[in-house]
Amino acid sequence: MTTRREFIKGAAASGLMFCSCALIDAAYAQGSHKHPNLGTRRKPVIVNGRQVRTIDVHSHCLFRDAIALMGAEARGVEPPVKGAPEHYIPLSDKAAVEERLAAMDAMGVDMEVLSINPFWYRKDRDTAAAIVKLNNERLAELSAAYPKRLTAFASLSLQAPDLAVKQLQEAITKQGLRGAAIGGSVDGEDFYDPKFHPAWAKAQELGAVLFIHPQSPPELAKRFRGNGWLSNTIGHPLDTTIALQHLIFEGTLDKFPGLKIIAAHGGGYLGSYAPRSDHSCFVSPVNCNPDIVLKKKPTEYLNQIYFDALVFTEEALRHLVAQVGASQVVLGTDHPIPWEEHPVDHVMATTTLSLAQRAAILGGNAARLLNITNV
């Protein structure tokens, strides 16, 4: 196996340069939520003599005034994780925003696309509308104040699709946001349901990206109990997988072929075991609707979907790229939750990727997909 020293030496000789940083020291690993290297700025990523601007499409934030509208349910919104305090970055808290930017610098991330995991899908229409209004206003403020460092996906009240259409229109055309962050379903209602089609039609019309970030399937809560936080480690990838498979098998992606979708966490399990889907209707025709005739094999829809690179190992990233293509993979970290401690190093150290592929994953694909031209 190639050592890290040998890889770095070889990479430098081949036109790829990067600065390796030990981002998480012992104090951070033992529970401190403060990043130990906030004053450290990584050297720029250089590929073939050109600087690569790195764009993280999967980063989170929260706003306390929006959460407060949840009433008695507000206490359950903040995730039970390291990095939870760093979610709160209102423009009015300059110190918090500067700490976020410093943490990005330490990771080598030039721009984050902020998003808020939907916590309002069970609320009534008016409450959800008020939460989304605050979220999108705060996200737009941050994006306007730091246009070279921060942009965002809007929040939507998808439990009221007609309202979501209006919110998306405003977010893209008036607030300068890049798309919308949505769950893996709307409180168990899957996205292929025709009630959601107006929202997908509007997203396609606007060229807006839909970032699917999962939530643990509530119907499996009993089985997820116990040690290991299985509701997240298994539940989240599973939720994304189910969401994507329904969009494929129910013909939603045929109906909206121009829909731009990014799936978090490498698309869940779909990228790892997609070929099984190509055989399901042959093996069990009774479980497939004869009125739904897909235009291509299920696996061929993967090149209509984008996947973040949050898959942890070089081998997992190699396999994801082999399955979906490097053009469909974008950088994602889940920041400020410390799932991915060395996102740039992860991509750079995956030796099966060409220089062009690494540059594309680190920022080129996201810039093209999100129409980011100010970096």
Show which residues each predicted segment covers.
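Mid-to-C-terminal alpha-helical segments outside catalytic/metal-binding sites
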Residues: T2-R53, V57, F63-M111, E137-A144, ...
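Active-site gating loops and adjacent loop-to-helix segments of metal-dependent hydrolytic enzymes
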Residues: Q51, F63-K94, P218-T240, S277-L302
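Active-site neighborhood of phospho(di)ester-bond hydrolases with catalytic His/Asp-centered motifs
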Residues: I55-V57, S115, F153-A154, A181, ...
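Histidine-centered divalent metal-coordination motifs
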Residues: H58-H60, H213, H265
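Active-site environment of divalent metal-dependent phosphoester hydrolases
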Residues: L62-R64, W120-R122, Q159-A160, G188, ...
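Active-site gating/metal-coordination segments in enzymes
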Residues: D110-E250
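Alpha-helical structural signal in soluble globular domains
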Residues: R138-A145, E170, K174, P198, ...
